[in-house]
């Protein structure tokens, strides 16, 4: 997570006062918790309430650099500022951590077990899981849209804000819109998780804490913070409030902090406050607090006398009453209660209103005290001690706001539009209720002073309106003044005039699916997307392919070839038949020479890439290449030949794909070295030394970019000298194959299975080093990793690198005949349907192309790939099949039949395993031994060959490696030699 700092130093907290004598007592009063010290004279009240849906009425703000409360916290940094990028990255990382925790709770990533709640009916669990998965999908879509709008659209947004003054009224920065949408998504996630998880469980506690961190990150406006201030995921909108108002360029270290302000307090936030010595928390929330962890922690802290909690309930959208302001001023003036933390739900509107009124109250009190210190009503001087007694007199305060009159203030709620005159609002302060007068004045010279102070303290203002700045920030004149001033942030930002209903409706109707097509309607924010004549967005990649007009090996353009742009990366894959590989490779140059000669006889042309696939004559005796390119990764070509003829496959974007079964051997060649490698290792802290050694070699000697998983990146980030290691976000790996040229795995077969799970579509070539317990698929020894990696990176330049395209299975779960969202899996080993812990035999109907072929009555059934034929399928009695044989293995598990034997199906088969309605019990399904989940009656799993195989780099050749693994791992056909007669 990005650390956010500012130009000011850390906040200086006064030393904590000694602990108060006596114990604190707790009592339940009219639905509220009242906590007070038994021996103390003051009472503090905290309401156990919190808002379920956060208020969207962010009308006030504060900027750390200027300490100007006219800033709008809900607007956030200026569009295009680096603080905006940092704020988005914080939210992204918090959302990723929540996503990982939720997915781990749904299904344990190590064991693959999906825990079941026995207090919920089995039929209701899939519905609850669907709700959680739906919210996760919505959150992911919002993050992707926010990334495009906040990160990619910085220049476009900044230019949109530099328009006319009238149009600026209707503009809200993309970060503010993104935070608002994600806040509502967090509330939906809280509702969904409340029905699925038990908060008292360990997994429930972890998810709840991460959800609170994400909510705080969304509440926070994103302004920079000083060193020593808490992280935005602990406290949103954390700012110090000073006693005096000074110019912007003054150092905050020289000022005395009156108190701190910010957003809601969570369990982790309370722990931080106690660690820093805070003595008082002032809670402005009027809503019910639904955070049971926080309520339990604060109750314990108050009962032990560690902290005091005072509740001054203020309704959402209103300002505090005069009695509440008095009460708060009394708390601030009491040095025994410092440090003090003032907060509301988000730390925006109600908190800013209280700060504004407190400052006005203190300023007026000081001014009147100064006047009466010079002259009293009779023209005589007033003693200073009496004046100070007046300003700090308890008679100015009340014990609560129960007897106060609610403030009549203009509100901006949904459906209302407020046009606010800024200058009028700043000077037209109104409060109808005056201060209580409970204490009589013994000195006659003080009576006039007190009466004048009470009559003047009417706060002739609506503080919510008073926070609005001028509305010409992004005008030409305003921006010119801003750049000339050389300030980090302007003194005011745009007026958040409510947008018209049509713009709101048009933005809400934006389809998330439209982003995938590249044609997004950004009318609400005046975003422009270049489109082609047919509406599809342009892609600037160039198509490199062979001219379809080649006949008899001769180019149709009389031998003239078009010059091709130098691309960043180029690769080629040559397919060699094992029958001719020995003779053709004897001199080491035969395949390459034939390919070069073919390229000399062919002609290349360049055309603009469109949305449709590349078609045309793929036969390639003239050239033998097919386009496979991305500007961000190495370019690859796939050619198949049996030594007599040459065929070429139609390959989609950045993928090594099957178009028909093949028993030929493939060879990988890079025309230019790759640039990016993904380094994967076993789970946990194991193999970190090996990972450091490989990462250093790849970066320093081979000049490659090294990517690791986020958890591993956190470890590397704490090791000096490994700042070059990069990471990616596990929430969205849809484009990871476009960034990675090949994958290096450290561990056993489980790491390769994990790599297969990371890449849901295309998979880059995988080279694995055996550091696990079995390592059937890992044919490379770690001791020679430098030589093996160099052979892969440089392609051996003449012979290439032999690879095996390992078939995967595409599995999809259906319920009531409809596909379940998010239930699509690519399997490298096998998919298993079994009875689980049920006492009855499982009954599974097996269909092939919608035709019933058999019913499995036993412990279950295995559908395995050739790669998985040496795993669970072998243990169940299935055959062991070479990984290059295109087939599926159908193996029963302990069938209740003497005639049910394993069978092998072609790779064109489309299987469906269904739990019939008359089955005695439900079944369970697992994919590669993980992601285990329940199948109810009527559910089914459809299985077919995946278009995207997993290419693994061989040590020597695919057949030799396979037999060596059989002998090394399974002791295949090991016996003593027969002696001669």
Swiss-Prot record:
Catalytic activity: NAD(+) + ATP = ADP + NADP(+) + H(+)
Regions of compositional bias (Polar residues) in chain numbering: 387-406, 551-563, 581-596
EC number, UniProt record: 2.7.1.23
Main location (coarse class): plastid
Region (Disordered): 369-413, 551-601
Region (Calmodulin-binding): 319-364
SUPFAM superfamilies in the cross-refs: (Phosphotyrosine protein) phosphatases II, NAD kinase/diacylglycerol kinase-like
Molecular function terms from GO: ATP binding; calmodulin binding; NAD+ kinase activity
GO biological process, one term: NADP biosynthetic process
Keyword match Disulfide bond: no
One Pfam match: NAD_kinase_C
Keywords noted in UniProt: ATP-binding, Calmodulin-binding, Chloroplast, Kinase, NAD, NADP, Nucleotide-binding, Plastid, Transferase, Transit peptide
Enzyme class, broadest EC rank: transferase
UniProt-listed InterPro entries: ATP-NAD_kinase_N (IPR017438), ATP-NAD_kinase_PpnK-typ_C (IPR017437), NAD/diacylglycerol_kinase_sf (IPR016064), NADK (IPR002504), Prot-tyrosine_phosphatase-like (IPR029021), PTP-NADK (IPR055214)
Subcellular location(s) per record: Plastid, Chloroplast
Gene Ontology cellular-component terms listed: chloroplast
Family named by the database record: Belongs to the NAD kinase family.
UniProt function note: Involved in chlorophyll synthesis and chloroplast protection against oxidative damage.
HAMAP family on file: NAD_kinase
Name the record gives this protein: Probable NAD kinase 2, chloroplastic
Organism: Oryza sativa subsp. japonica (Rice)
